[in-house]
Amino acid sequence: MSSPLKSPPDTIAIEAKGVHVSIAGHAILKGVDLQIPAGQVVALIGPNGSGKTTLLRAFLGLQTIDSGSIHIFGKPVGVDALAAVAYVPQKLALEPSFALSVREFLALATHRTKNWFWRKHQDIDRSLGAVIEEVQIAPLLSKPLGKLSGGQFQRVVLAFALLRNPKLLLLDEPTAGVDAPGEHTFYELIGEHQRRRGLTVVLVSHDLSMVYRHAARVYALNGTICCEGRPEDVMNAESLKRAYGIQVSPYQHHHHSGHDHAHPHSHGHVH
């Protein structure tokens, strides 16, 4: 829990008030109000088209809002506020021939990148510090990015994000297309870093069973915040039907379907 000695902005990682966003004349966010507490793993859930990624982009300053306000640790979204933020997207589509190595890619994340191409590998590795060990990618450093598996690539992107020493980590479907062992490893690493660094982690995911296991707080979005609270309070039949418009189970995995609503199928987990 946050110390009572901390200033109030430090206890709220993200505050959104009355956020409206329309894209191509279509209202996506319709007055979103939320406060995300600092130092927790929280999740945004909701059907396709509910505005989850749009809201995440607004947090990053990549999506202009029509009205309302967003503050990150008490500062309006902008250069100062975003210095504390790192982002892990869905898996990027890279050609297998993409030749930049993991080591070279991560060197770009450090502030000591001048002439990095000519530096010795051991010097680069030293500058990357403990992150390469913490994220379990030391054996991958010489591998081209284009040759990595989905799970390996997401661990590399996580390392890139953590090298910024963020206070807030935003994850947009970070394990989409990653196999079950890779997904498990990724979220175990997220949990370890959240606890070690006191990070605030905001996760967008369709995988409700994973959200139930890892999030301390859940926000169900469908244009507005339908409900929020602890997973056991939000992820019940009534609340999920309100968010998704159909009957879904909190123990199921929801894939992108390209339609307005997610289509559930069993994820194979029993709680």
Each language-model region and where it sits:
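Helix-to-loop junction immediately C-terminal to a conserved catalytic motif
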Residues: 60
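H-loop/switch region of ABC-family ATPase nucleotide-binding domains
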Residues: 205-206
